[in-house]
Amino acid sequence: MKNPFENAMAQLDKANKLAKFGDEFIARLRQPDRDIRISIPVKMDDGSLKIFEGYRVEYNNALGPYKGGIRYHHDTEINEVKALAFWMAIKCAVAGIPMGGGKGGITVDPGKLSKGELERLSRGWVQKLSDILGPHKDVPAPDVNTTPEIMAWMNDEFMKITGEKTGATFTGKPLDGRLPAGRPGSEGRGTATA
């Protein structure tokens, strides 16, 4: 059985047979610009230390900064994240959005963590990746099992580390304590429209 990234590359091959994009163009889309795996140590509420595996894939930034969500799921793994980053690059290009494709994640069942553990994990992801993030570099967003509150923690951690006072590094954050206008359900509405 193929993994998600192998499936994505099979789709690319099929599209190339139909559209004949050219070998050079296809070669550039076969691998991400960056494929980052990190270990995130988190002090658990019981005093123990647990190490979580995290990812960020920056697939292609030919059209603009990398853009894509961060997912928290017990089955998240690098081939899934690579495939999703590839598809994000394609979606942005097809829709004419001046962003590249990126995706991130952590292998975790967030329902098994306390709010404090979840916050420490989220901040730890940013601590490991802050050098590559930013409004003109890589702009993460919520995805599976991540929330506006998690995006707010991540943005806060980014600003603490870098000293940059920006709200543009992470999208999907609460605005004045409320959910961002239009965010809840926007993916579903977009899918229905497409």
Placement of each model-derived feature along the sequence:
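Short, Gly/Pro- and small/polar-rich lid/capping loops
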Residues: K2-S39
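Alpha-helix initiation and N-capping motif
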Residues: F5, M9, I78, T147-M151
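Active-site-lining helix/loop region of Rossmann-like oxidoreductase modules
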Residues: E6, A10, K50, E187-A194
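Hydrophobic, Leu/Ile/Phe/Ala-enriched alpha-helical segments that form helix-helix packing faces
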Residues: L12-A19, A85-M88, W125, L129-L133, ...
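Charged, low-complexity, helix/coiled-coil-prone segments
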Residues: L18-P32, Y59-H74, G104, S130-A141
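Glycine-rich, N-terminal phosphate-binding loop and its surrounding beta-alpha-beta segment
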Residues: I38-P110
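Glycine/serine-rich phosphate-binding loop and adjoining beta1-alpha1 elements at the start
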Residues: H73, A93-A194
